[in-house]
């Protein structure tokens, strides 16, 4: 799993995010903390992960479909290798659910 360079800050961010979701303030918090480009990058990363997990499309085709760099696809692919299979199944299930809504 990815280890943040500053675990205390990362843990505080995660806890603040958890509270925001519990209070229905997640949109406001993420808008406050992330620039439009950063929000777009997160959305792109989610699409990359979903397509990589689907395993129906080669990485080069994902790159072309999403109009992104090979390095961006590779970073997503490398992170998949670090995560547990159970978690990746959870991600696959939930990315499929959000695509179908």
From Swiss-Prot:
Gene3D superfamilies, per the entry: TrpR-like
Presence of the UniProt keyword Cytoplasm in the record: yes
Natural source organism: Mannheimia succiniciproducens (strain KCTC 0769BP / MBEL55E)
Record text on subunit structure and interactions: Homodimer.
Signal peptide positions on this chain: none
One GO MF term: DNA-binding transcription factor activity
This protein's record includes keyword rRNA-binding: no
HAMAP family xref list: Trp_repressor
One record GO biological process: negative regulation of DNA-templated transcription
DNA-binding region(s), chain positions: 59-82
InterPro entries: Trp_repress, Trp_repress_bac, Trp_repressor/repl_initiator, TrpR-like_sf
Family membership noted in the UniProt record: Belongs to the TrpR family.
Domain of life: Bacteria
Keyword entries, A-Z: Cytoplasm, DNA-binding, Repressor, Transcription, Transcription regulation
Gene behind this protein: trpR
Family matches, as Pfam families: Trp_repressor (PF01371)
GO CC terms, sorted: cytoplasm
Name this polypeptide is given: Trp operon repressor homolog
Cellular localisation: Cytoplasm
Stated role: This protein is an aporepressor. When complexed with L-tryptophan it binds the operator region of the trp operon and prevents the initiation of transcription.
């Amino acid at each position: 799993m990815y280890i943040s360079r500053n675990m205390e800050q990362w843990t505080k961010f995660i806890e603040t995010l958890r509270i925001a979701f519990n209070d229905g303030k997640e949109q406001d918090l993420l808008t406050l903390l992330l620039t439009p480009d950063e929000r777009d990058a997160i959305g792109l990363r989610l699409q990359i992960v979903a397509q990589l997990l689907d395993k129906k499309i080669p990485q080069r085709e994902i790159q072309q479909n999403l109009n992104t760099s090979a390095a961006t696809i590779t970073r997503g692919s490398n992170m998949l290798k670090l995560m547990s299979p159970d978690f990746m199944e959870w991600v696959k299930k939930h990315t499929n659910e959000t695509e179908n809504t």
